[in-house]
């Protein structure tokens, strides 16, 4: 038996050896004959093979330097429909593989930072008001540059918003006009804004010209055509959308439970034929006429009667019974179904009204989805599951509804209430892509105050901002830096500035004192300053203008800043109490001198008053505590025009700081104690401090109020009637039981 096995193994080995020699010999002969041909061709002056010619060739899997358009055309015929083949040269599909890494030149942004250039408007070109607002928002931003050599991003002055060929706003011959721009460079580093694309009957997303490698900031863009980390999805907004500012959200107070008269509402057109008609034609199945009110009308378009169905008359009658605004403000959820295009005006209307949007538009890339978590503010539905929508929203807990409603208000006010905010959000998203090492995270974008007011260039650590202490489980700062703004020379040891310096230095919370010397006279000698237990740093301003008091000096070592005018009169106890109050409200201005604003109906302008009334809206920075971050925001967020105005007038810097902080926090400042007089009355009338007694000084502040309100687009100041006093303040109890007992004597 074993002999048979041995014979079988030998026979198998011999057969394998014979096969190996046979096939190997064939390949060897083929190789030799090929070699002879190559050698013969070499003798005749033809191609001579390289030494590594016979090594096997493998395709380069990485191919790091393949042009983007070559990648685009590669395997283009695989897995595409006949329609896609017909449209292969249209702008819908060209550049579909573009990403920041392949179609954006980062080197333009390294030298000068993120600067945006807007092409000059060409003669005879019509521009719609909405596009004018977009361009104005860019030109008024801190990103704008008029020098194309300094630019990182380019925006066309040609109106690209409405690319519906049936629209009167449609710009003809845009393809040739764009190609003739000398900076176009096939769209590289360009941003194109678009609200409407395509036309009847299919409303494709074709913008009608080759966008090349340009980015799209587009409304109603589908997830299929959206290029992640390259395009930006923006909301569809009307031509009446405000350019700046915008109305605040309509949620004035939180009701518990958060349920309203209607559970779910919608009022809009019903499309009888064509794209977008399926969902709206089926809404009547869900409508119950009680807490679910979904109304549609057939009365729109020129030939609606030609296509009207048996339900049209009944739907039109029901449609007229309800007021849309009344429904919107009294509904818990608002249905946002797709129209002819994926986006809808109902989306922004629902956000502003604190009506939780129920999205019913399959395939829509939601606005700013790259940074906004829409699950915190909306219910994402499915058109195929329309009949399940009512039961789904009824199952949502009341706590969740309240959280959704509050988030709608935050998102509306932070990113959508004006054209300017929509444009700036778009630019900030692109800037975060370019400078990823200092980009904002999801918490910043989805928590108050939002991504537009939190500048990552200030710090990459959230604990350095005053808004996230609770989220991070951090305590507010335990020390402050006193910054004293000095504008008069030292001529006497009894001057108020020296008394103020000593009082601030005695505070248990004081880490250091900075004297900002904005006086025309030279710095006094060191021995002229009093000895203190904390360091005293004297900084001489280079420009010596009013805005210099709010520069983000590196010398400020604490997050808390006690801002003081040189003639302020405060005791150590008052400083301590104000700081302990600020620790509970680190995002606000906390201090002593309060002022207010009002609307003057006779002059139709804002007014400024220092009269003592039952409310206030400003706390002046002559004796106030706030977070150091507001120095950075004042210097880098506000436009140069406002700061130049402050410097020229040598006035209004404290008002501008109050405008800024109220715009960020949406909250009023906090006044402490009932103290009214905070200035030294014995200051010499020849000093610059006597400007407070100058009537022109007060008139300038009136003018400043209106200029600031015009730039912000609304009045950000908020009135408050709250004043914080120490516990047992003025109570008829023993003085020994009171912590801040000296305050009552002042």
Swiss-Prot record:
Cytoplasmic side of membrane? 1-7
Task: Please provide the record's keywords in A-Z order.
Answer: Disease variant, Disulfide bond, Endoplasmic reticulum, Glycoprotein, Glycosyltransferase, Golgi apparatus, Hereditary multiple exostoses, Manganese, Membrane, Metal-binding, Signal-anchor, Transferase, Transmembrane, Transmembrane helix, Tumor suppressor
Impact of mutating residue 565 to A?
Answer: Decreased N-acetylglucosaminyl-proteoglycan 4-beta-glucuronosyltransferase activity. No effect on glucuronosyl-N-acetylglucosaminyl-proteoglycan 4-alpha-N-acetylglucosaminyltransferase activity
**Per the record's keyword annotation, is Glycoprotein included, yes or no?**
yes
Q: Which GO terms describe its molecular function?
A: acetylglucosaminyltransferase activity; glucuronosyl-N-acetylglucosaminyl-proteoglycan 4-alpha-N-acetylglucosaminyltransferase activity; glucuronosyltransferase activity; heparan sulfate N-acetylglucosaminyltransferase activity; metal ion binding; N-acetylglucosaminyl-proteoglycan 4-beta-glucuronosyltransferase activity; protein heterodimerization activity; protein homodimerization activity
Q: Fill in the PTM field for this protein.
A: N-glycosylated.
Residues carrying sugar: 89, 330
Q: In which pathway does it act?
A: Protein modification; protein glycosylation
- So what does this thing catalyse? 3-O-{alpha-D-GlcNAc-[(1->4)-beta-D-GlcA-(1->4)-alpha-D-GlcNAc](n)-(1->4)-beta-D-GlcA-(1->3)-beta-D-Gal-(1->3)-beta-D-Gal-(1->4)-beta-D-Xyl}-L-seryl-[protein] + UDP-alpha-D-glucuronate = 3-O-{[(1->4)-beta-D-GlcA-(1->4)-alpha-D-GlcNAc](n+1)-(1->4)-beta-D-GlcA-(1->3)-beta-D-Gal-(1->3)-beta-D-Gal-(1->4)-beta-D-Xyl}-L-seryl-[protein] + UDP + H(+)
Classify the protein's membrane topology as the record does: Single-pass type II membrane protein
Determine the domain of life of the protein's source: Eukaryota
Specify which residues bind a protein according to the UniProt entry for this protein: 166, 203, 300
Where, in residue ranges, is this chain on the Lumenal side? Answer: 29-746
In the record, the effect of residue 27 to K is given as:
In EXT1; no effect on heparan sulfate proteoglycan biosynthetic process
Consequence of changing residue 692 to A: Increased N-acetylglucosaminyl-proteoglycan 4-beta-glucuronosyltransferase activity. No effect on glucuronosyl-N-acetylglucosaminyl-proteoglycan 4-alpha-N-acetylglucosaminyltransferase activity
- GO BP, one example? heart contraction
Phenotypic consequence of residue 567 to N: Decreased glucuronosyl-N-acetylglucosaminyl-proteoglycan 4-alpha-N-acetylglucosaminyltransferase activity
Q: Name one GO cellular component term.
A: endoplasmic reticulum
Q: Which family does it belong to?
A: Belongs to the glycosyltransferase 47 family.
* Name the record gives this protein: Exostosin-1
Species, as recorded: Homo sapiens (Human)
What is the taxonomic lineage of the source species?
A: Eukaryota, Metazoa, Chordata, Craniata, Vertebrata
